[in-house]
């Protein structure tokens, strides 16, 4: 990822925020994945969630988050997707402003 690739950083910050909030609510990874994609087999859903959170096996990069999946994540947490996006955006801005000060 480019040093200042804001959209990519935003997406990763959104995923990190969702992951953190799911953990705070006590959801296990597979349980949360099943909430996001209930029509999928649990193992398939868990693999997809892992690919979004970490890295996909074929590419070595995290899978991108679709708008539909972002809405599913927010709904599963009982939160507004716009609110989560604002928090993620601010987290990236803070990290970038902190990085600028360190250099």
What are these regions (language model features)?
Residues 37-65:
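Recognition helix of helix-turn-helix/homeodomain-like DNA-binding domains
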Residues 60-72, 100:
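Short Lys/Arg-enriched helix C-cap and helix-to-coil transition segments
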Residues 1-39:
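A short, Lys/Arg-rich alpha-helix, primarily the initiator
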Residues 53-56, 69, 85-88:
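DNA major-groove recognition helix of helix-turn-helix
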Residues 1-8, 75, 81-103:
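Short, charged recognition helix plus adjacent turn
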